[in-house]
Amino acid sequence: MQSTNAATGGTSLLRLMAPVLALVIGSTMLSACSSSTPSATVDGAPVTTLNMASTTGYTPQAINGGTDDYHCTLVNPQVKQNSFIVSSQFFPGTGKSVAEVHHAILFLVPPKLVRAAKTADDHGKGWTCFGEPPVLGTGIAQFLAMPWLSAWAPGHGKDVMPLTTGTPLPKGSLIIMQVHYNLLAGDLPVTPHVQLDTVPASANLRPTSIQPLPAVPNIPCPTGVTGPRCDRSVELKNLAKRFGSYITTFDAGLETICGQNPANPPSGNTTTCTWRVRTAGYIVRAAPHMHLLGKALSITLNDGTAHAKTVLDVPNYDFNYQNAINIKPWIKVSPGDTLKVSCTYDPTLAQKLPQLRKLPPHFVTWGDGTSDEMCLGLVWQVPLNASTKVDWKNPTGGIQIGGPPGGHRPGGRPGMPATSANG
């Protein structure tokens, strides 16, 4: 999708940003073992449950003076045949350590990238996902196009795909599990667990894909609150120190795509970005994501027109209840349609919430940390044609949206669609 105000140089900008557009959704995973158990059926197709559990757990560690840890781990789900994921659930562990998990994302590693992924995994130890992880080496660009399989945040619960739909999982694929650990909530060992319910490709489901829709927040310190980091330029330097220089490149690129001057974007307690649909399809599911200052998030189809339609409206956002919803009836989108994501924040919460009030006041913009912010709508999409066949060597599916997919990106977060910024 594309911002309606994107500059004509958007295509070149996206290529420039490719190495960093995967940075935002921190990651954490664990050594995992897989087991499969035949379960129920979906439209007569047998359901296989894949359980991927940590064997040792992971103890998060913040670096560079930060309070967050993004860690990636490679998991082998032991997929023996082309399959569709019909439901998934991430379990952030048990006990007090549950509060440390800010979010988790599962990325598909198709068979053609398995060898490179195993190299990146450093013999099962995983890797830190801030900036451009050197462990990924020259292969980082390939990871940017990896589809999302599932995304979790507090309160998200189980992802159950709408009937007749499923997320492609090719035979021989691996999974990268990212987990973002928030050390403001603690630093105990965490033992996540993932469960996937799959059916064979013969079920002929309509393939789903997840499209992130980001906008950059620029939230000044509240009236009467002062400090050195209340200056945006000072805070950008702090972000670069904590997460790497990619973060300022990412912010500037996304500002440009959303029609703003990256050197002096408008600041305030709201932000928006409008993206353009490039192919026909249906939106079947949606979810919000902001951090602790978030108050409201919405996604609107063709905002400002006689045909405007609300895709998602969360007027009372709660970080601890970031649930996704299945949309009924499905919302049809066509080339040229727009999707506008809008977010509202309350910066005074930084002086009220226990996790944030211990920190110095600061200007808040897009960043990987829990004390930073995001504006990210997620939509699950399927092709318009129910008989669309899956390319199992390169499964993407769904509609295409011009511009970059936002959201957390560890050193160039995977999930970028094959689209241009010029719609």
Language-model regions, residue ranges each:
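Beta-strand-centric surfaces of beta-sandwich/beta-rich domains
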Residues: 38-282, 287-423
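Bacterial N-terminal signal peptides that target proteins for export
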Residues: 2-20
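Bacterial signal peptide processing site
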Residues: 34-36
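C-terminal motif of bacterial Sec signal peptides marking the signal peptidase cleavage site
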Residues: 29-32
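Residue-identity detector for glycine
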Residues: 9-10, 26, 411-412
